[in-house]
């Protein structure tokens, strides 16, 4: 066991995590030269295109060190984005060490810090590495200062490398072997294996990626999940080198996969502990929690007959993404669809993109909302994730909204504009620290404000230099109201929004004005109103299209003209009673684009 090293790589987006992983796999000879491709471990198309890692992957590699010994290195690739922070913490708790990759030209950024703190809390040895030192803009001294300043770990002897050219990659591996401790654990003890990730394979069912902490696992053993109590016979065990390779057994300290003929992904939850049925472990490994969705949105098919296809697509996606939740819902305006829960905005975009790309769906998405805690006047508490389910104002005692703690990092030139943005978003400043040229701001901001367009606005006010990460803090009482949109006196449920009272009038006016531009003119007047409860806060009118009925009427008596006009008026009135206004798809997106002034 002294020759095993389990490690993962922590980095901000675009600091070269996947490229470094590619190089390490190449140096260790994990794949032949013809099988190498960029970002070997990112298996989804979206991961490649966006250059992000979503699911954790592993590679078991053997490396002959300069001291002549052969070491088994287990690389566990982690996602770097805040939406997937639970997956990151599970991947990290399976390691003894982590390579902290920092772009020498950019310095430390928000997600690096967030994941690095997670690693330090879990007691993982962090080994700093400066990447991209071949760039003319690289400034390694500055980056080292920032690492020591912001994160507070000693980085004087940080290894320097360039993952693109392969320069210094072996030094990184040597530093890893020297600094990271070998795994502890007893191969003879009762089995405890941590599920790092799980995904669905069309041929063998669910594949679980595990780190064996104690004990030994062989095919034909009976295992059980400690969170659910379900039992399964093991069919295969093995490792990925990144290709899968079956082994006779997996024992303490190793990272590999288990295939046990499990049919649904919900049975193999990330963070759960696997143990033997015959000789079970007394307690599960710490840190398991159910992941709760933070952001909700309605997904509807554009064609009503696509509903079943959408349901099948969601079921298939759910096989590979246990954190996605959905339930059927009906909207008067959009017909049948699903209310889906996501971990965050990036997660939502990815699910939408995968539905459109892999399953060829045409979707309408409603505005994303967060979950509110509503205390009703009879004392009961309900969770509202859909504006349409918000009780009437008279039945609400108080509404609590989710507050998140946001950490922002930016060069000091942009502090002013970022603070202004946070203030607009009803944020309250908790802390502000200067680290050399970088500034760290900590704010508490309502999650609802972040969901809309905070990230895009942050990037635009800071010219792309600011980076952020956020985590849920608590529910806090707040004065939020539901704004309904009425078209000719009828509520359109899919257009309801929940906003803070201070912005409700303004948002109502803006949405009404937007709708006026978007809804085509009808044969009769259309009134668009925004209402809070029974109180109308804004109104816009769309004038009717009308035919000039007097065109053929020359001279003669005025009563002749009056008669024609009256007749037209009657017709319009009748039309208005039976007609319904078609609301185009853009109207639902318009709500998203209403800027907060």
From Swiss-Prot:
Span of domain tr-type G: 2-184
InterPro entries: EF-4, EFG_III/V, EFG_V-like, EFTu-like_2, G_TR_CS, LepA_C_sf, LepA_CTD, LepA_IV
Compartment(s) of residence: Cell inner membrane
Species of provenance: Burkholderia vietnamiensis (strain G4 / LMG 22486) (Burkholderia cepacia (strain R1808))
Domain of life: Bacteria
Single GO molecular function: GTP binding
GO biological process: positive regulation of translation
CDD domains linked to this entry: EF4_II (cd03699), EF4_III (cd16260), LepA (cd01890), lepA_C (cd03709)
Principal place of residence: membrane
PANTHER family: TRANSLATION FACTOR GUF1 HOMOLOG, CHLOROPLASTIC, TRANSLATION FACTOR GUF1-RELATED
Family membership: Belongs to the TRAFAC class translation factor GTPase superfamily. Classic translation factor GTPase family. LepA subfamily.
A Pfam short name: GTP_EFTU_D2
Record field: catalytic activity: GTP + H2O = GDP + phosphate + H(+)
Enzymatic class: hydrolase
Presence of keyword Kinase: no
Keyword annotations from UniProtKB, A to Z: Cell inner membrane, Cell membrane, GTP-binding, Hydrolase, Membrane, Nucleotide-binding, Protein biosynthesis
EC number, UniProt record: 3.6.5.n1
SMART domains named among the record's database cross-references: EFG_C
Function: Required for accurate and efficient protein synthesis under certain stress conditions. May act as a fidelity factor of the translation reaction, by catalyzing a one-codon backward translocation of tRNAs on improperly translocated ribosomes. Back-translocation proceeds from a post-translocation (POST) complex to a pre-translocation (PRE) complex, thus giving elongation factor G a second chance to translocate the tRNAs correctly. Binds to ribosomes in a GTP-dependent manner.
Membrane topology, record value: Peripheral membrane protein
Protein name (database record): Elongation factor 4
Gene Ontology cellular component annotations, sorted alphabetically: plasma membrane
């Amino acid at each position: 066991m002294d020759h095993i090293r389990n490690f993962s790589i922590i980095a901000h987006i675009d600091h070269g995590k996947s490229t470094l992983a590619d190089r390490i796999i190449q140096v260790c000879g994990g794949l032949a030269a013809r099988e190498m491709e960029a970002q070997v471990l990112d298996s989804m198309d979206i991961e490649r295109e966006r250059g992000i890692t979503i699911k954790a992957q592993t590679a078991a590699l053997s490396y002959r060190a300069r001291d002549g010994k052969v070491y088994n290195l287990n690389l566990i690739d982690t996602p770097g984005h805040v939406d997937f922070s639970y997956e990151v913490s599970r991947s990290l708790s399976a390691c003894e060490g982590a390579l902290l990759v920092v772009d020498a030209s950019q310095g430390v950024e928000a997600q690096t810090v967030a994941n690095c703190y997670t690693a330090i809390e879990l007691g993982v040895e962090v080994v700093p590495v400066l990447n991209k030192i071949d760039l003319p803009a690289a400034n390694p001294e500055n980056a080292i200062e920032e690492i020591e300043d912001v994160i507070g770990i000693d980085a004087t002897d940080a290894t320097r490398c360039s993952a693109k050219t392969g320069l210094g990659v072996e030094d990184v591996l040597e530093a890893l072997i020297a600094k990271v401790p070998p795994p502890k654990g007893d191969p003879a003890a009762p089995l405890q294996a941590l599920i790092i990730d799980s995904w669905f394979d069309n041929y063998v069912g669910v594949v679980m990626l595990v780190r064996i902490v104690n004990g030994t696992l062989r095919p034909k053993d009976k295992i059980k999940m400690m969170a659910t109590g379900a039992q399964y016979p093991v069919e295969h065990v093995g490792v990925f080198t990144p290709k899968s390779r079956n082994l006779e057994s997996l024992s303490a300290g190793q990272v590999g996969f288990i295939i046990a003929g499990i049919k649904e992904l919900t049975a193999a939850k990330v963070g759960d502990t696997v143990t033997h049925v015959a000789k079970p472990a007394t307690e599960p490994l710490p840190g398991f929690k159910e992941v709760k969705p933070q952001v909700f949105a309605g997904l509807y098919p554009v064609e009503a007959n696509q509903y079943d296809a959408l349901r099948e697509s969601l079921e298939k996606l759910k096989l590979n993404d246990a954190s996605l939740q959905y339930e059927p819902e009906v909207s008067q305006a959009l017909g049948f669809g699903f209310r889906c829960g996501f971990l965050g905005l990036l997660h939502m975009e990815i699910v939408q993109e995968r539905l459109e790309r892999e399953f060829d769906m045409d979707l309408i998405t409603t505005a994303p909302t967060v979950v509110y805690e509503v205390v009703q006047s009879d004392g009961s508490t309900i969770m509202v994730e859909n504006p349409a389910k918000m009780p009437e104002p008279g039945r609400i005692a108080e509404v609590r909204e989710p507050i998140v703690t946001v950490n922002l990092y930016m060069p000091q030139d942009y502090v002013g504009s970022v603070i202004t943005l946070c203030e607009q978003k009803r944020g309250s400043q908790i802390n502000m620290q200067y680290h050399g040229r970088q500034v760290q701001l900590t704010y508490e901001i309502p999650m609802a404000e972040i969901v809309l367009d905070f990230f895009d606005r942050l990037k635009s006010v800071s010219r792309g230099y600011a980076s952020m990460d956020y985590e849920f803090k608590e529910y806090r009482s707040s004065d939020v109201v539901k704004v309904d949109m009425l078209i000719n006196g009828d509520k359109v449920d899919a257009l309801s929004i929940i906003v803070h009272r201070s912005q409700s009038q303004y948002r109502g006016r803006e949405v009404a004005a937007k709708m006026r531009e978007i809804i085509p003119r009808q044969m009769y007047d259309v009134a668009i109103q925004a209402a809070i409860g029974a109180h109308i806060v804004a109104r816009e009118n769309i004038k009717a299209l009308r035919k000039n009925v007097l065109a053929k009427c020359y001279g003669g008596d005025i009563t002749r003209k009056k008669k024609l006009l009256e007749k037209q008026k009657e017709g319009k009135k009748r039309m208005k009673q039976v007609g319904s206004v078609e609301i185009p798809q853009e109207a639902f997106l318009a709500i998203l684009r209403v800027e907060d002034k």
